[in-house]
């Protein structure tokens, strides 16, 4: 078999979205940040898999509203745009 098809030298995939334990009180905010980061880099499916939540999940509405306020205060227009997009999805459901 060609070495091109052998993955024996591959290591574990690097952790793209480091998150605290799910029972950690900071998990929802960290998950919201991970989902927004994933959307920013074009890896929404990876962020959703890492968090177990989806982009626009109403369970994270409060956290994303907090991130939106922070981004507006900091002048981070890209993060503001992503947070607003997330909240629009919350408002209309997962569709």
What are these regions (language model features)?
Residues 79-80:
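Solenoid-repeat scaffolds in large eukaryotic assemblies
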Residues 1-63, 74, 85-95:
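Long, non-catalytic architectural segments outside compact domain cores
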């Amino acid at each position: 078999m060609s070495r091109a098809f052998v993955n024996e030298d591959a290591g574990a995939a690097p952790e793209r979205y480091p998150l605290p334990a799910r029972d950690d009180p900071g998990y929802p905010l960290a998950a919201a940040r991970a989902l927004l980061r994933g959307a920013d880099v074009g890896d929404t499916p990876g962020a959703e898999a890492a968090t177990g939540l989806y982009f626009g999940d109403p369970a994270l509405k409060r956290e994303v509203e907090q991130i939106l306020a922070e981004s507006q205060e900091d002048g981070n227009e890209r993060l503001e745009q992503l947070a607003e997009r997330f909240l629009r999805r919350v408002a209309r459901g997962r569709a």
